[in-house]
A protein has these predicted regions:
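Ligand-binding clefts/hinges and TM-proximal coupling segments of bilobed small-molecule sensing domains
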Residues: 139-150, 225-293
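C-terminal segment of N-terminal export signals and the immediately downstream linker at the start
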Residues: 1, 19-28
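N-terminal export signals
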Residues: 6-23
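Short beta-strand-centered segments that line the small-molecule binding cleft or hinge
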Residues: 101-109
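Bilobed "Venus flytrap"/periplasmic-binding protein-like clamshell domains
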Residues: 27-53, 57, 111-179, 280, ...
Length: 315
């Protein structure tokens, strides 16, 4: 018996994460989004990544209206975890300071925001789009909320200074630009589906981002928006890097999520991160990025923080 204890004591603590939890199926309700935005392909890739390292972790996707809907459902306890953009998270915490806080499981990816227009138009700057019909995407989605903050940072109102379009589906936006029913489409993220569709058209697309002075102006009003760069070659015909603003998006947990679930999710995400073939959709979903993005360790779900400490990722 003494010898057995000695051998067990040599096994790293992180690999001894609750054996009972590993041996049991655990159901997690996961708020995603409607098709056509960046969350939908990410959610599918995340579920596949988690299944590859923890096959009996039963992630149940729940199709929602997007980031704001996910925040509302998390607060009510209707879902266990959900995808929420950084802009919606900032807004939710600001508007509901007295409610139990939604906690961070992990970052998803950073979301640089910009416009796409047909290349045969005369629009080259944001101010050129004033009064024009703009597809802001479905109301309450991370992209639409981000656009509102960016426009407010420039002293503009997305509803009064533009002719706003809020389609029911993300998929409607590119078609409206292609058919000239809209002058521009706002989107956020790398390889954002709407932009991929536009740039794959024979005519292609041209992107419009804030100028250097406009980026400074936006960040002066909303410091939580970071300066982000879309590398050249991300889309067909886009050869130069594009610098704009955006924020990290998150996997958030309901306030009373069991710490054992948080721990298991963090452990599985860490294993997926260290796998030899991470998905292109989840490559930014790392513990390092999560720790860099959160303002305080208190923002982390307690089970996640416990795993990070056992894995020696934080003190």
């Amino acid at each position: 018996m003494i010898r057995r204890r000695t051998l067990l004591s040599l096994v790293p603590a992180v690999s001894m994460a609750p054996f009972a939890a590993r041996a049991q199926t655990m159901e997690v309700r996961f708020g995603t989004s409607t098709a056509g935005g960046g969350f939908a392909p990410y959610a599918a890739a995340l579920i596949d990544a988690l299944k590859s390292v923890d096959p009996i972790l039963d992630i149940k996707p729940v199709i929602t209206k997007g980031a704001t809907d996910n925040a509302e459902r998390l607060q009510k306890g209707d879902i266990d975890i959900g995808l929420v953009s950084g802009e919606v998270m900032y807004e939710w915490l600001s508007e509901h300071p007295d409610k139990p806080k939604l906690r961070v499981i992990s970052v998803i990816y950073s979301t640089p925001g910009m416009f796409a227009v047909r290349p045969d138009t005369r629009y080259h700057r944001i101010r050129d789009l004033l009064g024009r019909s703009i597809v802001w995407n479905p109301r309450g989605t991370g992209s639409a909320v981000q656009a509102r903050y960016v426009m407010q940072g420039l002293g503009l109102d997305m509803d009064r200074d533009f002719d706003p379009i809020y389609p029911e589906s993300f998929a409607d936006g590119p078609t409206m630009v292609i058919e000239r029913r809209a002058a521009a489409l706002w989107g956020s993220g790398y390889r954002w589906p709407g932009f991929v569709e536009l740039t794959n058209q024979p005519a292609g697309a041209r992107f419009i981002v804030p100028t250097r002075a406009e980026i400074t102006q936006i960040r002066a009003k909303f410091p939580f928006l970071a300066e982000l760069t879309v590398p050249g070659g991300m889309y067909p015909g886009q050869y130069e890097p594009l610098t704009t603003v955006g924020a990290w998006s998150y996997i958030l947990a309901r306030p009373d999520l069991d710490d054992g679930i948080g721990y298991r999710l963090a452990r599985s995400l860490f294993r997926a991160e260290r796998s030899s073939m991470p998905s292109k959709h989840t490559v930014q979903t790392t513990a390092r990025n999560t720790l860099a993005a959160v303002g305080s360790l208190d923002a982390l779900q307690p089970g996640v923080l416990r795993f990070y400490r056992e894995a020696k990722l934080v003190q």
